[in-house]
């Protein structure tokens, strides 16, 4: 186990039977609230983002991590929002959930991502839906997505296969 994996494991809270019976929820809140833990995760994510000139953080904890990584890299950060949170006009990408669908959005005015080299940052890679939708959203706007980086990957849910051929760096896998 790597040093960063040990930090994450020691500060991650496991909540049984949430949000439903049989699910073992992995809560990263204690990690993000710990100054040393947050710095360690920020440094590790930033180390995977070499060459990026923009960081895209996915709603909601990806905002926190993405902003921290962008500061470390000296780049800007783009908040990829859940649908309906931004004023029009927006660029949007809809993706499927287990029951229904969801939408991610970025502003269509005042922001040109064409030609930018972007790294996607999020807290968890589970089914891969949000990372894959973010990838499509950014590339449709002309950006080059270098890769994605997450704190935690839930391997049993197959997200890595869903986002292929996009490469993903995971700091901790379960």
Curated annotation (Swiss-Prot):
**Catalysed reactions, as listed in the record:** AMP + diphosphate = 5-phospho-alpha-D-ribose 1-diphosphate + adenine
Q: List the disulfide bonds.
A: none
| Cellular component terms (Gene Ontology) | cytoplasm
The EC designation for this entry is 2.4.2.7
Answer yes or no on keyword Chloroplast.
no
Q: Which PROSITE patterns match?
A: PUR_PYR_PR_TRANSFER (PS00103)
Q: Which GO terms label this protein's molecular function in UniProt?
A: adenine binding; adenine phosphoribosyltransferase activity; AMP binding
Keyword field: Cytoplasm, Glycosyltransferase, Purine salvage, Transferase
**Where does it reside?**
Cytoplasm
Gene3D superfamilies for this protein: 3.40.50.2020
Which pathway features in its UniProt record? Purine metabolism; AMP biosynthesis via salvage pathway; AMP from adenine: step 1/1
Q: Which GO terms describe its biological process?
A: adenine salvage; AMP salvage; purine ribonucleoside salvage
| Superkingdom of origin organism | Bacteria
Family in the record: Belongs to the purine/pyrimidine phosphoribosyltransferase family.
Q: How does it assemble?
A: Homodimer.
NCBIfam families with a match to the protein in the record: PRK02304.1-3 (NF002634), PRK02304.1-5 (NF002636)
Described by its record, this protein's role is as follows:
Catalyzes a salvage reaction resulting in the formation of AMP, that is energically less costly than de novo synthesis.
Q: What is this protein called?
A: Adenine phosphoribosyltransferase
């Amino acid at each position: 186990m790597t040093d960063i994996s040990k930090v994450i494991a020691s500060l991650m809270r496991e909540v049984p039977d949430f949000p439903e019976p049989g699910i073992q929820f992995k809560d990263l809140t204690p990690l993000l609230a710990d100054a040393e833990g947050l710095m360690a995760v920020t440094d590790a994510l930033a180390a995977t983002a070499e060459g990026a000139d923009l960081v895209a953080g996915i709603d909601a904890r990806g905002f926190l991590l993405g902003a921290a990584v962008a500061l470390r890299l000296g780049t800007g950060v783009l908040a990829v929002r859940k649908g309906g949170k931004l004023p029009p006009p927006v660029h949007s990408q809809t993706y499927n959930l287990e029951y229904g669908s969801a939408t991610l959005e970025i502003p269509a005015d005042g922001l040109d991502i064409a030609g930018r080299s972007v790294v996607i940052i999020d807290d968890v890679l589970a089914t891969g839906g949000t990372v894959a939708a973010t990838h499509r959203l950014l590339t449709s706007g002309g950006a080059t997505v270098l890769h994605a980086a997450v704190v935690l990957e839930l391997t049993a849910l197959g997200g890595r296969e869903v986002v292929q051929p996009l490469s993903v760096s995971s700091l901790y896998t379960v």
